[in-house]
């Protein structure tokens, strides 16, 4: 089975490097990613652009929009990406640069970091971003749920706050990153109600295969997620993602295979990403 990783990172972020070294125990480089993807039959990754202007600075209010992938000098050939949006840096020049970037074949959407920046999804500060999404027919990805930084503010990342923007911008398809975890039942209602809302299941855990297995063996840890998946009862709305480098690729695939019904694997691991991110088609043909 071919797999698309619909959410990973490839940026020079201190916390990502520390996580790769100390928690997930992986090689956070193009070589390391290529080796993990090859072993797991991952044919394409969709990276989420993010940058910091100083060490351990994310969320960085000074990082220029569009935030890209700056881990290395070049982006791997099997990676497309969604440039990141800093709402504090959305002046005319930055919006023009963002729009110019959207015409590139490898740019397949945009990423808004709710919770990391203190604005709700429906705030007018993001209106120019939504207008560009409509103009270019691109999906918008939102960070939702727990933030990978103590400086984040959780109220802005709650999945219920996406309902208003999903209703207002029906012509845009949105992806709720992390399914709003731990508020996944609220996220499930937003997905169930809105035809233009999807979710990825990346970043639910951090660590090695042993760390993932420990949570899977727990009688309680995934109860909230299983409840939310059953409530939604529509696996055409969910995408696979790793949030690499937070976890190793193959162990996370194996974890998701335990949680997603076998009959939905083709959609979850591949087809739904092609549907939500149509610009990736030339990269997988």
Residue ranges of predicted features:
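Active-site environment of divalent metal-dependent phosphoester hydrolases
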Residues: 11-13, 52-55, 88-90, 117, ...
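Divalent metal-dependent hydrolysis catalytic cores, especially in the metallo-beta-lactamase
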Residues: 24-57, 78-86, 108-109, 115, ...
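Mid-to-C-terminal alpha-helical segments outside catalytic/metal-binding sites
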Residues: 1-10, 15-44, 226-227, 231-239, ...
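Short, electropositive alpha-helical surface patch
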Residues: 58-79, 99-102, 106, 166-170, ...
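Short, acidic/polar
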Residues: 27-37, 90-102, 184
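Active-site gating/metal-coordination segments in enzymes
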Residues: 59-156
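Active-site neighborhood of phospho(di)ester-bond hydrolases with catalytic His/Asp-centered motifs
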Residues: 3-6, 46-48, 82-84, 111, ...
């Amino acid at each position: 089975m071919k797999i698309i990783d619909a959410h990973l990172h490839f940026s020079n972020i201190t916390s990502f490097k520390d996580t790769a070294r100390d928690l997930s125990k992986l090689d956070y480089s193009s070589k390391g990613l290529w080796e993990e993807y090859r072993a797991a039959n991952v044919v394409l990754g969709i990276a989420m652009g993010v940058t910091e202007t100083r060490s351990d600075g994310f969320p960085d209010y000074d990082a220029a929009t569009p935030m890209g992938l700056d881990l290395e000098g070049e982006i791997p050939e099997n990676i497309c990406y969604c440039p990141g949006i800093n709402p504090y840096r959305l002046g005319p020049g930055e919006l023009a640069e963002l729009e110019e970037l959207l015409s590139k074949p490898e740019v397949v959407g945009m990423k808004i970091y709710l919770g990391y920046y203190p604005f709700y999804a429906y705030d007018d500060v993001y209106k120019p971003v939504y207008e560009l999404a409509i103009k270019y027919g691109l999906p918008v990805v939102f960070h939702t749920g727990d933030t990978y930084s103590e400086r984040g503010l959780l109220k802005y990342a709650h999945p219920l706050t996406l309902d208003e923007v999903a209703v207002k911008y029906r012509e845009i398809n949105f992806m709720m990153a992390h399914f709003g975890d731990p508020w996944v039942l609220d996220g499930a209602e937003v997905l169930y109600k809105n035809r233009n809302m999807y979710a990825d299941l990346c970043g639910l855990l951090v660590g090695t295969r042993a760390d993932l297995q420990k949570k899977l063996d727990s009688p309680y840890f995934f109860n909230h997620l299983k409840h939310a998946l059953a409530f939604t009862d529509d696996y055409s709305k969910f995408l696979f993602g790793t949030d690499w480098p937070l976890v190793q690729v193959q162990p996370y695939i194996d974890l998701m295979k335990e949680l997603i019904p076998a009959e939905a694997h083709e959609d979850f691991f591949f087809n739904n990403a092609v549907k939500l991110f149509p610009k990736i088609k030339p990269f997988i043909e």
